[in-house]
Amino acid sequence: MELTTRHPLERPIMRMFVAHSSGGSEKTIQHLGLSPDIVKFLREKWGIKELYPPQQEALPHALDGKNLMLTIPTASGKSLVAHLTIAHRLKHDLINQKAIYVVPLKALASEKYDELKEIANVVGLKVALAIGDRSGEINSIEDSDILVCTSERLDSLFRNRSNLISNIGIIVTDEFHLLHDHSRGPTLEVLISRIRHKKPDAQIIALSATVGNCEDLAKWLGAELI
C-alpha cells in the first residue's frame, strides 16, 4: 500500500483505500460547495484526495459562517479547514472584508503566509504578512484581503489603526491553547474580546491540538466544538 505526501497540508494517500471507496474523495470535497477552481487546486497542487472525518464535520459549519472551535490532534488538517473557509467566504459571503490569521510565533506566521498565498492566488485574493520586521508592511496590510500576524503585532495594529477591526470578517486563532499561557494568553484574550465587542458578526475559528476546559471556551466564543 503506497503512501504519498506532496504538501504539508496533504494527508497521506492510501491508494488502495481511495480506489475502492464507494463515494470517492473528490465527491466529498465537491459536495462542500467549494468553487471548481478550489477543488481542482486541492487535487492537483496539494494532492488532497480525501478529508479526515473531523474536517468533514467541521467544514460545513465553518463555510456556513458559524464560529468554530476545532480541537483535533496535530497533523489532522486543522489549518485546511481555516484556509478553505477563508478562501470561500471572502469571495462569496464577505466581499471587501478581511480575514486575519493569528499565530503565536513569527516562524509559524511565515509558514501560514506561504500556504495561504497558494490558495488565495486561485481565487484572486491578496495576502499580507505582519510580523513587525518587514519594510512596507503597512501598505501591504491595507491592500490585503488576508492578514497573517502574531497576536502581539495585531495588538499593535489595533492600537494604531483602530479602523482595522471594522473590516474583519473572519478571525482565525491558531494554537488557541496558548490562551492559558501566562505570557501570551492575556494578549490573545484581549484581542478576541475586543473583536467580539466591536465586530460581533465576525466569524471566529479557534484551532488547537490540546486545550483544557474546551467546552467552556467554546461557550465563551459562541462556537461549535469539534
What does each model-found stretch correspond to?
Residues 1-53, 57:
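N-terminal intrinsically disordered, low-complexity tails of helicases
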Residues 33, 39-226:
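Conserved P-loop/Walker A NTP-binding site and adjacent catalytic elements of P-loop NTPases
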